[in-house]
Amino acid sequence: MGSERIMTTQQQFLDLLSDIEPSTTTVNDCSSAHNTLRDALKVHNEFSKVHVHTFLSGSYKRNTAVRPTTIGGITQRPDVDIIALTNHTINDDPQIVLDAVHTALKDIGYTDLTVNRRSVNVKLKKVDMDVVPIISDGYGGYLIPDIHLEEWLVTNPPAHTEWTVEVNKNANGRFKPLVKLFKWWRRENLSDLKRPKGFILECLVAKHMNYYESNYEKLFVYLLETIRDSYGIYASLGIIPHLEDPGVAGNNVFSAVTADEFKTFFEKVEEQAAIARNALNETDDDKALALWRQVLGNRFPRSASHKSANSADMASSLIRSALGAGLTFPSTPVYPNKPGGFA
């Protein structure tokens, strides 16, 4: 019974992972949007003078994004990060560089624009894009403008992408799926919390996941419990832990997280770790399903045994209806195309 439930639950997690992947439509929308913008920047009559090249960053590039959520019947837009390497120098004022990006985008025809601290946000009907200008530091690294601090800061977007690939390889391909589960968990449980999110969650998973476990149920429980056991003292004292930025030595990925945000995040992890542990120990499929849905939401699927029973009933009903209507069936099975992930 125990081994059967482990296999069943592993399939439930794999089914959930398939379900929370960005759809082919979403991927195509993102691809079309970022390519159009990047091509336009490259040939813009003014920006082309400072343009060196552009590349993608963020969860879209790292293949750690989950499907856009729907709030109040409205599907939220996916985020795409576009890095624009320019030939500006450290002597150029950060505001001037961001203004140059903003002016070019406005001139190209984008209307819903917001100049943020380190980027220009572009809102389209189906996609949000952040255009982030960076410059070379002259030594193989990069600098990013910060208009609040009015200075250039060390950054390294390509290193984050390379790091993600390496960590996923070390985890036998299970790092990125676990990140997606953790991001989905956060959305289900802490959707109103501003931070931690995104890349911070990826760093937490990399630091605290079990690299030798292959079962996703156990991986997820272990992740929550290890985060709970590692950061209780920080939450109780109201201080922010240091989690090293894998791209920039000495940087703390938690630096923008407030003490209150971290405490809220920690308390939810603590609460949910207990529920997840109970779900792992539960031998009754229905009770385990109810517990996992408390943790990962109502999209968490039923076990294969439940689905196969329901499918058999449905298939029988459909066949009876089809025969009654005089329909014919194809001689070979037709398989649906599974949605691909972000690339």
Swiss-Prot record:
Pfam families: SMODS. CDD domains: NT_2-5OAS_ClassI-CCAase. GO terms for biological process: defense response to virus; nucleotide metabolic process. Gene3D superfamilies: Beta Polymerase, domain 2 (3.30.460.10). Keywords: Antiviral defense, ATP-binding, Magnesium, Metal-binding, Nucleotide metabolism, Nucleotide-binding, Nucleotidyltransferase, Transferase. One of its GO terms (molecular function) is ATP binding. Induction: Part of the CBASS operon consisting of cdnD-cap2-cap3-cap4. The keyword Transmembrane helix does not apply. Its EC number is 2.7.7.-. It catalyses: 3 ATP = 2',3',3'-c-tri-AMP + 3 diphosphate. InterPro entries: NT_2-5OAS_ClassI-CCAase, NT_sf. Its cofactor is Mg(2+). Belongs to the CD-NTase family. D01 subfamily. This is Cyclic AMP-AMP-AMP synthase. It comes from Acinetobacter sp. (strain ATCC 27244 / 9458).
